[in-house]
């Protein structure tokens, strides 16, 4: 048979393990949310211009093509021509 002091120690350990497990679950959720990395993928790629031998144009990746020497202009037009799909 278990003595009362052994039973008390067992109960303290059991309660401590439950509290530790609850803490780890909360900590794990925080770490999961903090580890979500957002990667920006430009809608434009560098390509060779039709009028040049160098890769100095930026063209849309999507269905509708547009090329520009300026990356900002390309991104703006590509997002207008090929809007990103909504996330599920």
UniProtKB/Swiss-Prot annotation:
Disulfide bonds join 44-59, 49-78, 57-74, 60-67. Residues 1-23 form the signal peptide. Keywords: Disulfide bond, Signal. Expressed in stems. Belongs to the MEG family. This is EMBRYO SURROUNDING FACTOR 1-like protein 11. The lineage of its organism: Eukaryota, Viridiplantae, Streptophyta, Embryophyta, Tracheophyta.
């Amino acid at each position: 048979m278990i003595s009362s002091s052994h039973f008390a120690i067992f109960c303290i350990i059991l309660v401590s393990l439950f509290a530790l497990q609850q803490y780890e679950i909360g900590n794990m959720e925080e770490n999961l949310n903090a580890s979500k990395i957002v990667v920006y993928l430009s809608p434009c790629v560098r390509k060779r211009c039709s009028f040049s031998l160098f890769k100095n144009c930026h063209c849309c990746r999507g269905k509708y093509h547009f090329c520009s020497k300026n990356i900002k202009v390309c991104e703006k037009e590509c997002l207008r021509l090929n809007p990103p799909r909504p996330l599920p």
